[in-house]
Amino acid sequence: MNPAERPDTSLCGVRLAIDWGKARIGVAASDRDAILAFPVETVHTADRPVQRLAEIVAEYEPVEVIMGLPVALNGTEQLAAQDVRDAGRQLTEAINPIPVRWVDERMTTRTAARALHEAGRNARKQRGVIDQAAAVAILEHVLEQVRLGQSETATGGADS
């Protein structure tokens, strides 16, 4: 992996994570010290999502935006990956010069749904919450990599 494909572990500051789904987009943010990840909002894909995400980026002023990329268990990109990559390109144009990075989002939605179920919340009635929790899971993984100085799951920039 070339250095341009890795999250910049030297940058302090807020990071945003996006879990782009067919109907909803979960958004999460970190604190400036890259310690905590927390849910921000669920954006509906029918409601001009790139514009709303650009507004969130302007509000949080992140050092980078991390987008989850749908990857199958065998490591190949899922069918939805091209749609997510297209959305990532649009977002990159809207928020330039803030970089957009890709991260393998394997199992994040299932992990989020399971965690909500274990917390006693009905996942079917909380779909927007699941999307936010999936974005939090993506971001927590990246923050752990930043703390460890690693970035094995990054899969390239938005132009990949």
UniProtKB/Swiss-Prot annotation:
Kindly list the GO molecular function terms attached to this UniProt entry: nuclease activity
Output a single Gene Ontology CC term carried by this record: cytosol
Q: What does this protein do?
A: Could be a nuclease involved in processing of the 5'-end of pre-16S rRNA.
Cystines in this chain:
none
Carries keyword Cytoplasm?
A: yes
Q: Which InterPro entries match?
A: RNaseH-like_sf, YqgF, YqgF/RNaseH-like_dom, YqgF/RNaseH-like_dom_sf
Query: Which organism encodes this protein?
Result: Cutibacterium acnes (strain DSM 16379 / KPA171202)
What sort of enzyme, by top EC class, is this? hydrolase
List where in the cell it is found.
Cytoplasm
Provide the taxonomic classification: Bacteria, Bacillati, Actinomycetota, Actinomycetes, Propionibacteriales
* Keywords of this entry: Cytoplasm, Hydrolase, Nuclease, Ribosome biogenesis
Q: Which family does it belong to?
A: Belongs to the YqgF nuclease family.
Give the protein's recorded name.
Putative pre-16S rRNA nuclease
EC number, as in UniProt: 3.1.-.-
Pfam families cross-referenced by the UniProt entry: RuvX
Q: SMART domains recorded for this chain?
A: YqgFc
Answer whether the UniProt record assigns the keyword Hydrolase to this protein: yes
GO aspect biological process, one term: rRNA 5'-end processing
